[in-house]
Structure formats: C-alpha cells, structure tokens
C-alpha cells in the first residue's frame, strides 16, 4: 500500500506539472476532489474496521459453539485462508474489468449517451453472469481435486464446493459496484458496503455461537445476496435517472 501511494503521488505530481503548462484551470478542483474523496475514505475506514471486528469475532463464535480453540482457528483458516482464495481467484479479471469500466461509463454519462450506458451495463452484466456460472460449475465439479491438489485437504475441497453456488452473486456484485462508480455513485456504493459489514458483525455475533461453521456460511450467503440486491437496485435506478436526463439530440 505504501509503494502504491508513493507511485500514485509521483504520477499525480507529473500530471499536475504537465497541465500547468497551458490550458484552462478548473475552478475549486481541490475542494471538489475532497468532497468525493473524504466521504469515500471515511466509509472505507469504517468498513475495514467492521470487517476486522467480524474476523475477530469468528474464532470466538466458533469456540462458543463448542469447538476447541485449535478447531475454531482451523475452521476459520479453512474457509478464509483456503476455500475463499480459490473461489475468488478468477474474479481478479473482473476487478480489472470493473476499473476499466469506470471512465467509459463516466464519459457516456457526461455526454448524455443513454444508449451507450444501457448497452455497456447490459453487456458487462451478461458476460459476467456467463463467466461466473462457468466458474461455479467448474468449482463444483473439481472442488475435491482442487482441495487435495492445492492444500492436501479434503475439508478445503468441501468448503470450496459449498461456496461455489455463491460465485455468480459475488462476481456480479463486483461488476455492479464498478458500474455504480462509473456513474458517480461511489458514496452510495460504499454506504451499502458499510451496511453489509455492519450486518456481518451482528450476524456473526448472533449466529456463530449457536450454529458454528454452518452459521458462518449462512452469514456469507445472506450478506452477499443483500449486498448484491441493494447494489443492483441502485444501479437500475441510476441508469433510469441517467436516461431520464438524457440530452436531446441537437
């Protein structure tokens, strides 16, 4: 993170020096940037803190469910350190796609091109769904061999299989968040993520002492579905509003 910050600062300094050489200045640019950046930063810090609290509560909840300390940490490690990395690994392509999507949608929104916005969003969600469903099928079919090949663990394969049906929801949520950022909904998108993290803390605290790992799997499914439903609903409303404000042809 420190190296990334230094690189971004250096690139910003170079760009700023280049644009100082000529051209019109943008009034109140710093104030406008901070108006977007500060709420996002505060929301990101809040979500990170809540996620950390959730991860601290998981082993304690598993221990309260009757597991020994070693078994509780083992169960937590299998889910978070083994199964989830395998399930989420293919989504690195979608994260790159979501980042590339932001300027495309922003340009279309500023230009008032409703047709382009609809086409981009529809195409990306459709292709993401195909990719996610294919990934889920492969994970379901090869969960056992993957667990044994990568971790030499049948338990890891079992949890990969249990998490595989959640892949379409997780991957679609990634692309949906990218679309929302491109359409200027960063703050609302982050608010949904903070709500998701808060809900995760409450459910982990309430369910894990009673249901153990089964309760944690329920929390993962429930939170991902709630997050995607809220994000997708916001995306539909944002696209409709953009199209309602479409600039008439000259």
Regions found by a protein language model. Give the residues of each.
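Residue-level signature of transmembrane alpha-helical cores of multipass secondary-active transporters
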Residues: 1, 32-48, 81-84, 88, ...
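Short runs within selected transmembrane alpha-helices of multi-pass transporters and secretion channels
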Residues: 1-9, 158-182, 188-204, 208, ...
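Interhelical loop/hinge segments that connect adjacent transmembrane helices in multipass membrane
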Residues: 9-44, 238-250
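Hydrophobic, small-residue-rich membrane helices and short re-entrant helix-turn-helix hairpins
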Residues: 20-33, 69-73, 102-122
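Helix-terminus/linker motif at the lipid-water interface of multi-pass membrane proteins
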Residues: 45-89, 147-149
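Helix-loop junctions and terminal segments of transmembrane helices
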Residues: 87-111
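Selective transmembrane-helix segments that form parts of the transport pathway or gating/packing helices
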Residues: 124-136
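Short membrane-interface helical motifs at transmembrane helix boundaries
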Residues: 134-152
């Amino acid at each position: 993170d420190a190296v990334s910050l230094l690189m971004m600062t250096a690139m910003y300094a170079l760009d700023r020096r280049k644009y100082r050489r000529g051209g019109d200045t943008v009034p109140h640019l710093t104030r406008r940037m901070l108006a977007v950046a500060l709420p996002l930063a505060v929301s990101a810090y809040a979500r990170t803190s809540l996620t950390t609290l959730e991860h601290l509560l998981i082993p304690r909840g598993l221990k309260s469910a009757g597991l020994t300390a070693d078994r509780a940490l083992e169960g937590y490690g299998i889910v978070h350190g083994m199964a989830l990395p395998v399930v989420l690994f293919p989504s690195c392509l979608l994260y790159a796609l979501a980042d590339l999507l932001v300027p495309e949608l922003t340009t279309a929104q500023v230009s008032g091109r409703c047709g382009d916005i609809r086409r981009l969003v529809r195409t990306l969600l459709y292709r993401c769904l195909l990719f996610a469903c294919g990934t889920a099928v492969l994970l379901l079919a090869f969960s056992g061999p993957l667990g044994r090949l990568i971790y030499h663990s049948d338990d890891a394969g079992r949890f990969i299989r249990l998490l595989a049906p959640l892949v379409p929801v997780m991957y679609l949520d990634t692309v949906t968040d990218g679309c929302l950022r491109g359409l200027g909904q960063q703050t609302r998108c982050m608010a949904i993520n903070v709500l998701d993290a808060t809900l995760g803390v409450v459910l982990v605290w309430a369910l894990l002492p009673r249901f153990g790992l089964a309760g944690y799997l329920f929390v993962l499914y429930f939170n991902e579905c709630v997050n995607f439903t809220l994000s997708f609903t916001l995306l539909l409303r944002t696209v409709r509003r953009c199209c309602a404000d479409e600039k008439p042809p000259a």
